[in-house]
UniProtKB/Swiss-Prot annotation:
<dbReference type="Pfam" id="PF02393">
    <property type="entry name" value="US22"/>
</dbReference>
<dbReference type="GO" id="GO:0019033">
    <property type="term" value="C:viral tegument"/>
</dbReference>
<feature type="compositionally biased region" description="Polar residues">
    <location>
        <begin position="1"/>
        <end position="12"/>
    </location>
</feature>
<keyword id="KW-0920">Virion tegument</keyword>
<feature type="region of interest" description="Disordered">
    <location>
        <begin position="1"/>
        <end position="46"/>
    </location>
</feature>
<keyword id="KW-0946">Virion</keyword>
<protein>
    <recommendedName>
        <fullName>Tegument protein UL43</fullName>
    </recommendedName>
</protein>
<comment type="similarity">
    <text>Belongs to the herpesviridae US22 family.</text>
</comment>
<dbReference type="InterPro" id="IPR003360">
    <property type="entry name" value="US22-like"/>
</dbReference>
């Protein structure tokens, strides 16, 4: 194949054919910022190389510092602007490095916290859980973990066996004092708010099966806060600790909020009775978690006419109770929805009546706390007072625990049914 005159001229000049030259542009700049003169008209101008060569060339030269546009335009760069630009880039580099270091530190802390939580859970479900937990707590005593709720609350590993926190209680026999048939109950730390003043920390205990409890020193009772072990406790926080929900929770009304607020402001049974006469048949709704609950206010005559009124007085150990309203379609366990009547006694305590058994169950210490905590305690009251299983008559029926925390695996229940009897 014969060559064209242009290719003959290029080869004779000692140049390589233009299609194989990986050049990027025909204009180059010298170190002083001036543009070189173009080639003579007799030499044909080279066009950019093929796209494949261009990509390889640009990739191989990506590490080079190409001159700014000001250089190509013939503008001189002063030493002051260079220094300012260098200082600016140094500051950006330092900030980026500090952010990266902080992110790495947080990631490391989170990873260590997750590993510690998992190790605590593993120790709580071993065959020798009490001894394994004691060793772990003494090794990591003072370590702090952040809880998901409430905001600003922390869990701190602490060896309460050596501190003597429980004083007169026999800490080695706490499971016999408060629980039904658990083999051990060991304190592993406390929960508190870092800036709280005058609020005593709440001890956290782990029982058989990894279940987590919180001890309330005010009423000397244990509250079951996590059935899924220590990992569930850290993830859920104290959402299942009803006294704290009553104190720190919030009320959300959907409709008829003015009616609900009037009930929260009522001070005694007489004020509630007058409010029922005034708001007879009124409907308002509020949210309990993700559920919107519709509430119907009863009239004054219905507050005392229920045949079970005398039984409610005995079950709640009250001098007087008032049936104020009915909450419709409340979701309970086993995917049931019930219409629950709400009772209030002379001290302001709130109770819910199961529609099937007509028994009263304690819900909250007041109507404000009831709208905050909702039906968390309804048929789910795992609050264990001292000797509540050995002497159940010491606790009023409405305040008694729903049952053993082991539920169907309760050793006393299985022994009573003869499940352990030899055939």
């Amino acid at each position: 194949m014969e060559k064209t005159p242009a290719e003959t001229t290029a080869v004779s000049a000692g140049n390589v054919p233009r299609d194989s030259i990986p050049c990027i542009t025909n204009v180059s700049a010298d170190t002083r910022g001036r543009t070189r003169p173009s080639r003579p008209a007799t030499v044909p101008q080279r066009r950019p190389a093929r796209i494949g060569h261009f990509r390889r060339r640009s990739a191989s030269l990506s590490f080079l510092d190409w001159p700014d546009d000001s250089v190509t335009e013939g503008v001189r760069t002063t030493s002051a602007s260079v220094a300012a630009s260098a200082a600016r880039f140094d500051e950006i580099r330092r900030r980026r490095q500090s952010i990266n270091d902080e992110m790495k530190e947080r990631t490391l802390e989170d990873a260590l916290a997750v590993e510690l939580v998992n190790e605590t859970f593993r120790c709580s479900v071993t065959s020798d859980a009490r001894k394994d937990l004691q060793k772990l707590v003494r090794r990591v005593s003072g370590t702090v973990l952040r809880l998901s709720w409430p905001n600003g609350w922390f869990f701190t590993y602490c060896d309460l066996l050596r501190v003597g926190y429980f004083g007169h209680l026999n800490i080695k026999g706490l499971e016999k004092t408060f629980l039904c048939c658990d083999k051990f109950l060991l304190p592993v730390g406390t929960v508190s708010r870092c800036e709280a003043i005058g609020r005593p920390p709440l001890p956290v205990l782990i029982g058989e099966g990894g279940r987590v409890y919180v001890y309330s020193p005010v009423v000397e009772s244990l509250y079951l806060v996590s059935r899924s072990g220590f990992r569930g406790f850290v993830q859920e926080g104290l959402r299942n600790y009803a006294p704290l929900r009553e104190e720190l929770g919030y009320v959300r009304f959907e409709t008829g909020g003015d009616v609900g607020r009037e009930f929260m402001l009522a001070r005694d049974l007489l004020a509630l009775w007058r409010l029922c006469m005034k708001r007879e048949g009124s409907i308002f709704s509020w949210r309990d978690g993700n559920e919107a609950l519709t509430t119907v206010v009863l009239n004054g005559s219905q507050t005392y006419e229920d045949p079970a009124h005398g039984n409610w007085l005995k079950e709640t150990c009250s001098l007087n109770v008032l049936q104020v309203f009915v909450v419709r379609a409340v979701p309970v366990e086993s995917q049931q929805r019930l219409d629950i009547s709400i009772l209030v006694n002379e001290s302001g305590a709130v109770f819910g009546v199961h529609p099937d058994t007509r028994q009263a169950h304690f819900l909250a210490r007041g109507l404000l706390g009831f709208f905050r905590v909702g039906f968390l305690r309804f048929c789910n009251n795992y609050c264990f007072a001292r000797d509540c299983f050995t002497h159940p008559e010491s606790v009023a029926p409405a305040y008694r625990a729903t049952g053993c925390p082991r539920e169907l695996f309760c050793r006393r229940l299985r022994k009573k049914k003869g499940l352990f009897a030899r055939r």
